[in-house]
Amino acid sequence: MSTLFLRTLREDPADADVDSAKLLQRAGYIRKAAPGIWTWLPLGLAVLNKIEDVIREEINGIGAQEVHFPALLPREPYEATHRWEEYGDNIFRLKDRHEADYLLAPTHEEMFTLLVKDMYSSYKDLPVTLYQIQTKYRDEFRPRAGLIRGREFIMKDAYSFTVDEEGMRQAYMDERGAYERIFQRLDLKYVPVFAMSGPMGGSASEEFLAPMPIGEDTFALAPSGKAWNVEALHTPAVEAVDCSQTPDATKRATPNARTIDEMIAFANAEYPREDGRDWQASDILKNVVIAVKHAEDDEHDEPWRELVVVGIPGDRTIDMKRLEAQFAPAELEEATEDDLKAHPELVRGYIGPMGFGPQARGDDGTAETLRYLIDAHVAEGSAWFTGADEEGVDYYDLVYGRDFKADDVVEAVQVRDGDMSPDGSGPLSFERGVEIGQVFQLGLKYSEALDLKVLNQNGKTVPVWMGCYGIGVSRVLACIAETHHDDKGLAWPMNIAPAQVHVMATGKDEAAFEAAERLVDELSANGIEVLYDDRRKVSPGVKFKDAELIGVPIIAVAGRDTVNNGTIEVRDRDGSNSENISVDSVAQVIVDRVHEALK
């Protein structure tokens, strides 16, 4: 370590917001270059390379072949798939000296597709799976959590190409199995969850989430063991309500009752329910105006904005991430004052369903109006207390399906503990996690957009079926650090630690240093990776703190006991074991322990 490019820190960096970011910087694995951009130091690269080796072994094992694409990519392929516009501000764009447009790669679907198109033209060439481990770039608005949410990151992405859908599904299952083996070998707990495909497109997708409190993703767990990202969670069909005895809808004056609380208070005072119970938030249909920001498309030469009205139960809250997932790749935000002013039919505090959607388009269905969407929790036949699109007026007993309809049913509200699972196995519970991998069945999205076709067995030209499979390599490293540490520092699994044994000599007696050097030589001769702290002018206390901070699994100390008793202390970094072993046998004991840990 006297020559290792390393500087440990005793204090947490001021802007580090999660444990992994604090410890990886303090232990000398990474250094911050700019927000969301990191420099990898020798110890960090050692761990990163070992993680990549595990990934390569498993992905090569299912027959995939490694390639390497440039990070600087031309605009044209991304225009063909509309992702030049869909990515919006989330990508780094630049021009060369000739004013040609380029981007720093956020993903490489287009390039993989074009490469196969350029080289293959027959079903005889397929199936094939290609992958790379490459740096990606995304212009994160607010980078956070160290390596977990960065603007530059390392990713393994693979793409399968098959002649039919069955082949795509088989490739998907092969990759999925490889992912499970990878995360098991990395000692990283994971949960596969059903997910939305988002801008990637395709018919099916699963995320691999590492459960931890700092995770940005919330996932739902069913008693059956199945799990869903909340964006992909589908509300079980709500049983229709018999409305045959429900009175006709009536308008009633409700002055100055614009909020849910004001509506409840006014109704309980002025219009008591006939069944004797109080009005509650769950009796109210809340109508929320949402702005949908679309990218330019075939019908619009520039980005455009659409307002929609979404009806949800009054005791629920809009979940913008869940709702936005159904509009992907468009982005959503709450309507602004300018939006509302542009539509005088939107009466603040009294917005209801009757002024929008199918019921507002007239008998011939051609009248122009905003789309009206309804949350999946609203049952057919249910009666509601809701706005009448007039100042100071609300509807009572307005029935969904009888009095008003929706253009579409959407998943709009936040899910909560106790909601029924989609598979009907019981109530849901929720955890947070970090996405460490995702697999997609892309189908024909990219092959059709980029005209990737082959001749099949019958001589017919057909589009190629594709799958996409990603692992956030640098994020995986951060997640392992996040879950493998204590209050003293990091504690790496044996197979990816920067070294397998951390040997140190303490004190001033030359005999301790000689014993440490002999141990290093014996371990190295047996193929053991050693980090040797040979620093002469550093106190034992500092050496111990550095060893615990760096996190090598086995620590061997040559010091006073070595000089006096002929023993070397061998301790496990996790604190599970510590013993003094004779200098004559210590090397073999350590070799056996390392080999056992690597089984």
Swiss-Prot record:
Keyword set, alphabetical order: Aminoacyl-tRNA synthetase, ATP-binding, Cytoplasm, Ligase, Nucleotide-binding, Protein biosynthesis
Q: Name one GO cellular component term.
A: cytosol
Sample GO molecular function, one term: ATP binding
In terms of InterPro entries, this protein maps to: aa-tRNA-synt_IIb, aa-tRNA-synth_II, aa-tRNA-synth_II/BPL/LPL, Anticodon-bd, Anticodon-bd_dom_sf, Pro-tRNA-ligase_IIa, Pro-tRNA-synth_IIa_bac-type, Pro-tRNA-Synthase_IIa_type1
What reactions does this protein catalyze? tRNA(Pro) + L-proline + ATP = L-prolyl-tRNA(Pro) + AMP + diphosphate
List GO BP terms, alphabetically: prolyl-tRNA aminoacylation
The record describes its quaternary structure and partners as:
Homodimer.
Q: What does this protein do?
A: Catalyzes the attachment of proline to tRNA(Pro) in a two-step reaction: proline is first activated by ATP to form Pro-AMP and then transferred to the acceptor end of tRNA(Pro). As ProRS can inadvertently accommodate and process non-cognate amino acids such as alanine and cysteine, to avoid such errors it has two additional distinct editing activities against alanine. One activity is designated as 'pretransfer' editing and involves the tRNA(Pro)-independent hydrolysis of activated Ala-AMP.
Q: Which HAMAP family match?
A: Pro_tRNA_synth_type1
Q: Which family does it belong to?
A: Belongs to the class-II aminoacyl-tRNA synthetase family. ProS type 1 subfamily.
Q: Which PANTHER family match?
A: MITOCHONDRIAL RIBOSOME PROTEIN L39/PROLYL-TRNA LIGASE FAMILY MEMBER, PROLINE--TRNA LIGASE
> What is the protein name given in its UniProt record?
Proline--tRNA ligase
Species annotation: Bifidobacterium animalis subsp. lactis (strain AD011)
